[in-house]
Amino acid sequence: MSVCDHQRRWVTLAACLMLWLSGVAFAAKPVRHDVLIDMFIWWNAAYKEKDGFTEAAFGKYFTPDAVLRVNGSDRSKGLADLASHFRDIQARTEMVEIELPFIDEFTSASGDRIFTHHFVKAREKGQASRERVMGYAAIRDGKISMINFVSVPDAAAK
């Protein structure tokens, strides 16, 4: 085997190694987690449990004075109200799921707001629906102090 043949083999081997390593690096990209994603993962699981929505459980993710605002209307204020609000939703629906991963998500430069674009699917009285949700969660001391979302029916779901 000539020197040129050895060089070609090494170049080919090096190129294959580089491609393999780039694939490993891409596949090993860590999944992003923050308090909003962690809360929605918990929320999806809690919805399926009879006593999943408790004040204490919400307290792991929300500040005591947290506000849930949807389409400009305050739906709940405080941990007890959040738990009650979502127990009511749980009681009147057959299924609700926040679709993960989000379509898009980013954190403000100051780190105090997490912006998201995602879907929520549900079934109530046998009728399936899907909402497109956009907005932000305000973060204080590592917890959600406010969720401010705009939610509209997803036209593609019809």
Per-region residue spans from a language model:
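N-terminal secretory signal peptides that target proteins for export/translocation
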Residues: 1-7
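A solvent-exposed, acidic/Ser-Thr-rich amphipathic alpha-helical stretch
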Residues: 33, 55-107, 112, 127
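Short beta-strand edge/turn micro-motifs at domain boundaries
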Residues: 130-158
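Short, low-complexity N-terminal intrinsically disordered segments enriched in polar/charged residues
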Residues: 4, 13-64, 158
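Hydrophobic/aromatic beta-strand elements that line small-molecule binding cavities or substrate pockets
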Residues: 86, 100-106, 119-121, 132-138
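Short hydrophobic/aromatic-rich beta-strand segments that constitute the beta-sheet cores
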Residues: 68-70, 116, 146-147
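A mature extracytoplasmic/lumenal domain signature
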Residues: 72, 118-120, 151
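Generic short beta-strand segments
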Residues: 65, 117-123
